[in-house]
Amino acid sequence: MRITWIGAALASALALLAGPLYALQPPATLALACSGPFAKNSSHLKLAMFFDSKNITFTDIKYADGSKVPASVLFPNDQKRRLEVWWSNPTARSNIHLIVIGGQSTWAAPGGLRLGQTLEQVEKLNHKPFKLKGFDEDRIATGSDWDGGALATVAGGCKLGISLRADAKASAEKIDALSVDEEYSSLDPAIRAAKPTVSEIVIGY
């Protein structure tokens, strides 16, 4: 009886070992690092092996201007866990070019960046103020310089970029006064008055 139990337990253990690493080691939080499955030399196959092939697809990402970018998408049917991975070699689906956190995704980027964070929260992660461009026609401002802060250097050799959307209550007049062609400090009173929050995070190699 004991031998039978041990045999069954061993069979179960071997079955687990044959499964994807994500199933064996599910992350406590969806935290992204520029290493492991998200290292520069990763591939669609490596992501499929880590997260399970049923949780990834390769498709064209469509943008409002009509352009398309071929990319691997993790958890395509789960807006909270969705993650886009663009490849330097799209044909081979290898060597990461960009990782995009957008929409309603709850992934945390290196350094603790998350969607929805305020200027003050990003400054705290950076350990100092940073610079950003003014707002475009969609009320989006783009981070332009971490100014030597903590987010300027990330382990693994990747770079962090963010976009911030102005608060819906910020007046069009105040937003238009902050030119997209100009660079501002995150401490600028006019920028802070717009109360922008992080709307997209890009991790690039």
Locations of regions flagged by a protein language model:
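Positively charged n-region of N-terminal signal peptides that target proteins for export
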Residues: 1-5
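Short helix/turn-capping signatures at newly exposed starts of structured segments
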Residues: 19-205
